[in-house]
Amino acid sequence: MANPIRKLVDNSKKQLKKLNHIADKVEDYADEMAALSDEALQAKTPVFKEKIADALRDVTETDKQNKVLAKTLDALLPEAFAVAREAAKRVLGLYPFRVQIMGAAVLNDGNLAEMRTGEGKTLTATMAVYLNALTDRGVHVVTVNDYLSARDAEQMGQLYNWLGLSVGVNVGDAPAEEKRAAYDADITYSTNFNIGFDYLRDNMVRRAEERVMQRGLNFALIDEADSILIDTARTPLIISGPGSGVSQLYGRADRFVKTLQQDEDYKIDEEAKTTMLTNDGIHKGEIFFNLDNLYDAGDTALTHHIDQALRANFNYINDKDYVVQDGEVKLIDQSTGRISEGTRLSDGLHQAIEAKEGVEIQEENKSMAQITYQNLFRMYKKLSGMTGTAKTEEEELREIYNMEVITIPTNRPIKRVDYPDLLYPSIRAKYNAVVKLIQELHEKGQPILIGTGSVESSELLSKILMAQNVPHNVLNAKNNAKEAEIIANAGQRGAVTVATNMAGRGTDIKLGPGVADLGGLAVIATERHESRRIDNQLRGRAGRQGDDGFSQFFLSLEDDLMIRFGAERIRAVWERMNLDEEETVIKNRLITRSVESAQKRVEGNNYDTRKNVLQYDDVVREQRELIYHQRDIIIDESQSLDWVLMPMVSRTINRVVTVQTKSKKPSEWQLQQIIVFAENVLVNEGALTENDLSGLSREDIEAKLYALAKENYANKKRQLYEPEQMLEFEKVVILRAVDQHWTDHIDALDRLRQGVGLRGYGQLNPLIEYQNEAFENFNKMIADVEYDATRTFMKAEIRQNLKA
């Protein structure tokens, strides 16, 4: 049996050999490009574009086009990369290193380049972006926030503009015209959030010219790809409309759970992040709400509100999971430490937290359109990404996105020292040790970056440092306005920076004068994050580009991660070694391995959650793609939609006639009901009598009704003198029916997904149950769309002054 470790090593060597070969080819062009004048170098862009156009000129089939295009880009890669490289030197004063060429080749292949902090990912991307922008199909450079989109577009846009390519920035609240212009550019910088919502909104428009993304999804290059493809994947993008108001049960449920005692009335499951009532708690609930049975089948709304109130009060912590700002509950992205603006928890949980915090409870919204980031990015013809940390999630990236994670060598050897974790018996003892080390390092002027797990922890440590007269800056979700400035100065002599996870990404920390002689940047972490990637990002802040530096993690048995997964086992070791003194510390690789084992369990749970979200969205995906495709056909039609509308009429007639003539005896057929249907939906009252249908076969009845409908259609066509008016009328009728029933369907599926998990208690597979009901509901929705479109069109009264 082959050794899997050996296989991975061999595969890695093979990949690096291929990348080195590509880098050789690019570097072979270096002297030739350096000898060109600016005009000659700039003239390469139209030459490349012409070569691509020539290769695709006689290819019409889409799949074949994509293959020819990929082959053409591979052939152009060495020279195009060399052009972009030389242009970067002239325009930006930066000349990509060999390892950056290798990283760009990985990106062009549709894979993920893992490059250490400070290795120049932004410059690396320029070569792959330039090559793929030559196709005139659009390149989307995806970032985690609007600030980075604007910054990178401004900095790198100088290079692209110089090479004759246009650059656009898609900002969240920009008008549609500006968004359209940004997407029409050769290269578009945008956040994943903006692209996702623009895609959903584009599939809700009624006119082709209202779309902002006119070219579809071609090539996406994602910066901080692990954050976008992994960390945000648990939360689907949802466009909502007004709901049915605010339930009074939120306040009542919140008041009830605040009367309960832990362990006696409820038990908290830290691992699953849920809280359940005990028998005593259930009894108290029955008294509080004056009920005989709290879990009566007819009172599921109340129990749902109680469940959410329990989670809100005991699983979601202020200043850790969310903050309250300006009278609103705002979520904190646990992977970045930043506020997730505009994001709300679903299923009434956000409202339960609002009730807990005593702020205005906003009404629940109705889901109108939704998609997961997984399915959004899987729609791109080519997807690539770059980040400093992704190897730990390689399996998920391969399985979900079909991307390989390829680690790019550093330009200089890494000199940073990562010390083993230090474990203390209590949080107090841990903080004492942290502050002691900070004071020692600060006295000699060595810059220190202290990573904390939450806003609450950062503020606690800040208070301790203030009491010890240690000057410092604090960076967290409440104080992110000066993020770039604070992080940029964090490497200066004497700087002490306390930060949440937001310090792990974005702006580089460059060492100030004399800092290298002091040992470089010191990274101190006050706890382990539940993801190894986040820890590695924090470590990677020290030792960039071969700088000196070190990282040290301080843990305690009272940390959240330890309580959830590792504390009991480690406490047993503690007791066997008689280490019960408050200041005792364990410094052992075994502790580090135990913690990493706990992290792997959390990562596994999180992966299962993301996979579960995707499995449910995959059920909707086929339906969504079908509906969106049909909408596009209707919107883009330029002649007539009779070929869409009349088959809808035919199928509607067939469904009604089939139901009303299901008896084998024609004498038992419900002919009067068919006439009622015809008068309500197809024709004017009195246009059809029972005698007209008596004696006819089922097929003849359908043919009779269809002939009347066809005649009605022809009359309307004559009444609307201009073909454009008829087409516009058809579009409005069909799209209104589709949109109304599709949004109702999406909302129903959302509610089904939230409740279907309970069927697991009945030994049923919730996902299969969801699939079956979603399929049945979709077929019913199609029938409802066709019925409404038929009725609206056939019963509409056309007036001479009608403007569609």
From Swiss-Prot:
The protein's Enzyme Commission number: 7.4.2.8
The keyword Methyltransferase appears for this protein: no
Name of the molecule in the record: Protein translocase subunit SecA
Subunit structure: Monomer and homodimer. Part of the essential Sec protein translocation apparatus which comprises SecA, SecYEG and auxiliary proteins SecDF. Other proteins may also be involved.
Pfam families, alphabetized: P-loop_SecA, SecA_DEAD, SecA_PP_bind, SecA_SW
Catalytic function, reaction form: ATP + H2O + cellular proteinSide 1 = ADP + phosphate + cellular proteinSide 2
Lineage: Bacteria, Bacillati, Bacillota, Bacilli, Lactobacillales
Keywords: ATP-binding, Cell membrane, Cytoplasm, Membrane, Nucleotide-binding, Protein transport, Translocase, Translocation, Transport
Superkingdom of origin organism: Bacteria
Species of the source: Leuconostoc citreum (strain KM20)
Function, in words: Part of the Sec protein translocase complex. Interacts with the SecYEG preprotein conducting channel. Has a central role in coupling the hydrolysis of ATP to the transfer of proteins into and across the cell membrane, serving as an ATP-driven molecular motor driving the stepwise translocation of polypeptide chains across the membrane.
PANTHER family: CHLOROPLAST PROTEIN-TRANSPORTING ATPASE (PTHR30612:SF0), SECA INNER MEMBRANE COMPONENT OF SEC PROTEIN SECRETION SYSTEM (PTHR30612)
Molecular function (Gene Ontology), one example: protein-exporting ATPase activity
Membrane topology: Peripheral membrane protein
Biological process annotations from GO: intracellular protein transmembrane transport; protein import; protein targeting; protein transport by the Sec complex
Binding of ATP, residues: 100, 118-122, 508
Gene Ontology CC: cell envelope Sec protein transport complex; cytosol; plasma membrane
Similarity comment: family membership: Belongs to the SecA family.
Location in or out of the cell: Cell membrane; Cytoplasm
